[in-house]
Amino acid sequence: MYAKLIFKNAKRSVKDYLIYIVTMTLCVTLFYAFLSISSTHYHPTIGAEYNISLLAGGMKLAICGISLLLLFLIHYVNRFMLRKKQKEFAVEATLGMEQKTIGLLFFGETFFLLIFSVSVGILLGMVVSQVITAMLLASFGEPYAFSWSFFPDTVLLTVGFFVVCQILVGVGNVRILNKSRIIELMTANRQNEKPLHKSRWMPMICIFYGILLLWMLEVGTVKYHFYFDSRHPLPVKLMYWGNVLFPALTLLWAIAGAVLHRKIGFSRYLCGLLAGAVLTAIPIFSIAELEKAYFLGFDAPTLNQYLLFGVADILFIISAVIYLSNAALLYWKESKVSRKYHNTSLFLFGQLSSKLATNTKTMTIICVTLTFSICLFVIAPVLTGWSLGYLDSRAVYDIQISSRYNDVYEVENLPDTDYGEITAFIEQNNIAIKEDLTFSEYLPQKSDFYQRVKYDFPPLAIALKDYNAVRKMLGYEPITLQTDEFATHWHRAAEDKDIENYIAKHTLLETDAGTLKLSENAVFQEPVGESIYNLYTDVVYIIPDEIAQVLLPVQSNRFVMTQYPLPFKTAEMLEQLLGRSYPEDPDKDNLAGYSTTVHTTEVNRIIALNFILKASLIYGAIVLMVMCLTVLALQQLLDAEKNNYRFSVLRKMGVEEKDLHTLVLKQLGVWFGMPITAAIVVAIIVIGYFLQSVSAEISAYIGCGALMVQVGIIIGILFLLLICYFISTWILFKRSISEN
């Protein structure tokens, strides 16, 4: 009997459950689609040199971890449905049904609809998974062909995940209904909330921000004491002063405002804190750029600490802006009587002000989450494009190995090897070789061998014949030099202004074999690999062969190009052999370390990690975006249910249906527009700062044009999602207030 009642109630209330069905179906679709490539039954055609098993485990962990956020969304949607049906539950309880039974029936309804949503979501996920497969094949450079596939293990994982989530949420709903009194269920929609000025949300945030300011002041003072130098350039001095002065002044205002809050008023007090927070953020976010430009010597924990301060400062700014925007709405309403009583403005202001306390908290959380989502959407193509672009520079040769002398402190211990293990492996496995080059790199002066100051290592030099051999391997034209000339080869990420400044200061090169002058054609920047550069340098000197014979060889390299790509298993065996024979970090001191790269395994590793990163960021951004827009929509639809009577009164007073729809549009415009606008503004600032900090890498590895195309696509997707949610909410809101 109960099963029939559950089915009948679900069928009768399908309109009420529509938002629940759509949300759950969308969540299941995304979950199945992104998780499908981790299935043990997933075997795309990508060639013998690739192996996707590297990304299956990481993909499963990343997607399942991010999907825990869906537990909150499922909980919120269930609570929305619970509130929506409170009157119905009260009537059933009044007629004699036990509240425990009511709770179980509600759980049965939601569980039945969950199974329906999961079924539809898996079918849609099979279609969407083709998009994920196309992304994966594009990452490996393989063509995409549609193939309908079904993965039983992914289906079981999807069903299990959402069933467990629904059971956890459903048990909570049953407990809530058991503890609720009938009168509470009957009158829940009539309860008023506290006015905005009595909300404790913002005062608590101010207290936490005051504690943060004290911490920032302490850190800024310590860094000033240990790192400040009067010889620093003016921008660095301003940064040090700002990291002490602005937190101190803001903290002083916070203390004074707390003491004199009755005279000042909370809104003025918060305006002062907001101004201080903006000023405090300026020197904090300048640290990374100044560290990059002037090598200030801040260690990673210090930079991470200031990053934490910057993020916390932004969160406070968002909270303050949302609160002050709502306070400004109330002030604007009361500032002029004619404005308040113009047409239906009084009703609109009443609608907005009645939920300011709750909505301020919700809008703040949504704004922060939405900002994070937008940042993830934009940062995803930057990070993944950077990673793939860097791969083109790192894994240039099929096999490459280079020694490093930075841990060798005696010239006698410098390695002198031709890497014979590679030769033996090639012969043993019958690998066809296209090009094979072994060469050394030198220090211009032997005294430079003992120079080990970080960021001040000397550039290496390469003989002209070896440099031209490298260029030939990569398909570049050879270069020529006079016997008394030298040229330079620069890292792909080096900026033009840095190259020009360096060349202007280094027109002569002092070597142990004499002085060389700069060639007329002295700058080359084609990608030739990462290993030819010394630590913390972006340039290599190209010198005549006769000069190189006199200099001290400190780095030994071997680059091999094969006729055909190495199979993955063969490449893995070679990588393990090189790791044993030429360790990156030798156990003994005063021995050289080695950097080895096998193209096949490196490409597999980087593409796998890159795809996991890209998929995780996009999936996380979509989940957060859906959560924010769903919460916004549900909040307004819940208000529509509560305020149905108010709109019916306006209708009876003669207000036309067109004007009522305009009121709805204005109300939705405020509650949708406020957090979204704030999130977009903050995201633009954060993303602008991030793009500026990695501008050199973007130019070198991605290209501004390609990045703008990707960002444009992302903006279009975000705008489409927003429009769909806004229009859907508007239509459902109008339908809700028109029912009676």
Per-range role (PLM):
Residues 29-61, 135, 371-397, 610, ...:
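Alpha-helical transmembrane segments
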Residues 51-68, 140-168, 195-208, 234-248, ...:
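Conserved transmembrane alpha-helices of multi-pass membrane proteins
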Residues 29-40, 76-80, 113-142, 154-179, ...:
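Small-residue-rich transmembrane alpha-helices
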Residues 15-22, 33-65, 83, 232-249, ...:
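Peri-transmembrane interface segments
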Residues 391-611:
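Nucleotide-cofactor and metal-assisted catalytic machinery
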Residues 14-20, 106-124, 159, 163, ...:
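Selective transmembrane-helix segments that form parts of the transport pathway or gating/packing helices
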Residues 1-29, 196-207, 263-265, 269-272, ...:
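N-terminal Sec/SRP start-transfer signal
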Residues 5-16, 72-112, 189-196, 630-669:
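Interfacial "coupling" helices/loops that link adjacent transmembrane helices in transporter permeases
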